[in-house]
């Protein structure tokens, strides 16, 4: 989507975390000692506007699990503080595909973060990745809630995107009610937005590196290497 100069599809975004951390200040003694909800809410109301104030693009696709629910979750906070309608693009990929991709990555890149945690084997690493407060669990929670709010969501199946990317991208433009931009689907660029790129030294080399030649799903042999107990527990999560 970033080939279109009018659109920015962000890297993994911190905006939802900003809003949640501001909300959690309400649990601190210093706030409860002088509970000025209105003033703090004023800041929460403009998190997105301030964060993206200097971005030149017309449309920002903010990548984060906005539909996660809780007490409150991201979805509840957004409904209160964003103050305008918003749409969600939801990517669906079978969980075993996701875990196999992680296995391939951390096996081929010794500095990958699961290898830094004194975890003994693949089963321990995958269980760590699937912990309740981890990124995968948050995304699954968001997807579950997305199906309850399908009127505001557009669902993109990973297999469809990698089989006919142009068709799926056109559907996204229709959902956004924006004119189609002629994208190229070969000779792809690594993600770079407003001059910034991922620093994968933080999480492990190549975590966000894409294959540049073309968009195509390739068989991942690590599917056969996923431990049996992981398959038994999570293998039913398919889209």
Place the predicted regions along the sequence by residue.
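PAPS-dependent sulfotransferases, especially Golgi type II membrane carbohydrate sulfotransferases
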Residues: 106, 147-148, 166, 174-239
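Broad structural signal for hydrophobic residues in well-ordered alpha-helices, predominantly aliphatic
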Residues: 1, 51, 78-79, 172, ...
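CE4/NodB-like, metal-dependent polysaccharide N-deacetylase domain
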Residues: 46-56, 139-147
